[in-house]
């Protein structure tokens, strides 16, 4: 899907199935757990701005909205995505009473109009080169006042083979069936992230690399 010309309908159906995959594989759990920790010292009436890079269907930001309601946290939610089709699709999938500011644009050209407390990004960084990733981390270091979190895949034979079989049985969108194993093959091991963090100028002790079930490798930093 990264290189193929895609219709609006195909892209929407693909994102919808990816959101189903995210729900079934507990993709957003580590992000929400980190936000629990990251906001622990905020006053009850203190607002925090959360920016999601590469929001796709918008399902992570909707989960963050639900989390904020459960926890009684005051949050402003913003998303930026490179694909112009993501914005109308994410907006259409979001209830009218859920306030999320979905934007279209290149993150490297994006300068937030208001201070951002936390930057999050899920299942997006495997689409970047190592050089782009180092630039992205440096960008987050500048933009995120309190911290940032990257959730992505762990490159391993087990999810590579299991996902392909599961996607075929579930009859998910053809892009999901094809791109899932490709994404796993393009994803990361701990040594990869250490090199990327070093290239970005982030000290080893300043960031945390943590593995989560099922085969998620997440990188975070609290300031």
Which residue ranges define each predicted feature?
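C-terminal alpha-helical "lid/dimerization" subdomain adjacent to the S-adenosyl-L-methionine
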Residues: 153-198, 208-209
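Conserved beta-strand signature within the Rossmann-like core of class I S-adenosyl-L-methionine
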Residues: 145-153
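Hydrophobic adenine-recognition pocket in adenosine-nucleotide-binding enzymes
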Residues: 124
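A short, conserved alpha-helix within the catalytic core of class I
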Residues: 128-139
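Class I SAM-dependent methyltransferase SAM/SAH-binding core
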Residues: 51, 57-59, 63-109
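A conserved beta-strand element that flanks and buttresses the S-adenosyl-L-methionine
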Residues: 120
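Class I SAM-dependent methyltransferase Rossmann-like catalytic core
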Residues: 4, 8-39
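Core SAM-dependent methyltransferase catalytic element
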Residues: 208-223
């Amino acid at each position: 899907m990264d290189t193929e010309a895609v219709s609006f309908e195909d892209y929407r159906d693909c994102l919808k199935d990816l959101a189903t995959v995210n729900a079934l594989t507990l993709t957003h759990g580590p992000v929400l757990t980190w936000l629990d920790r990251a906001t622990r010292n905020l006053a009850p009436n203190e607002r925090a701005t959360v920016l999601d890079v590469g929001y796709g269907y918008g399902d992570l930001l909707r989960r963050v909205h639900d989390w904020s309601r459960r926890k009684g946290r005051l949050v402003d939610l913003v998303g930026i995505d490179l694909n112009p089709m993501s914005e109308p699709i994410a907006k259409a999938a979001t209830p009218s009473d859920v306030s999320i500011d979905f934007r279209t644009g290149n993150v490297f050209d994006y300068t937030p109009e208001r201070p951002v407390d936390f930057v999050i990004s899920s299942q997006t960084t495997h689409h970047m080169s190592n050089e782009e990733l180092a630039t992205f981390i440096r960008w987050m270091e500048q933009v995120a006042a309190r911290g940032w979190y990257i959730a992505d895949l762990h490159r391993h034979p087990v999810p590579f083979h299991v996902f392909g079989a599961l996607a075929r049985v579930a009859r998910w969108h053809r892009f999901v069936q094809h791109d899932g194993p490709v994404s796993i093959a393009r994803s990361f091991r701990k040594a990869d992230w250490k090199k990327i963090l070093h290239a970005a100028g982030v000290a080893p002790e300043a960031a945390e690399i943590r593995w989560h079930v099922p085969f998620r490798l997440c990188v975070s930093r609290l300031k």
